[in-house]
Amino acid sequence: MDPKLLDILACPLTKGPLVLSEDKTELISKQAGLAYPIRDGIPVMLESEARSLNVDERLDK
C-alpha cells in the first residue's frame, strides 16, 4: 500500500486514522474497532465489509 494513500485515507465512520496491519491485508481503525480488508491492493472502505476487532486486537498498540 502506498504510504501517501495511507496518509490520506480515514475511517469512514470516525474520520480517524487508519493503520496498515502487519500482514498488509487490512486497514485498522482502533477508534471504530474495525478492520477494513484490502483486496487486490484496493482498500474496501465499507462498514458492511469490515470485521470487528477482537479484544486482543483492540488492546494491541
UniProtKB/Swiss-Prot annotation:
Pfam families: Trm112p. It comes from the Bacteria. Gene3D superfamilies: 2.20.25.10. InterPro entries: Trm112-like. Disulfide bonds: none annotated. Coiled coil: none annotated. One of its GO terms (cellular component) is cytosol. Belongs to the UPF0434 family. This is UPF0434 protein PA2980. It comes from Pseudomonas aeruginosa (strain ATCC 15692 / DSM 22644 / CIP 104116 / JCM 14847 / LMG 12228 / 1C / PRS 101 / PAO1).
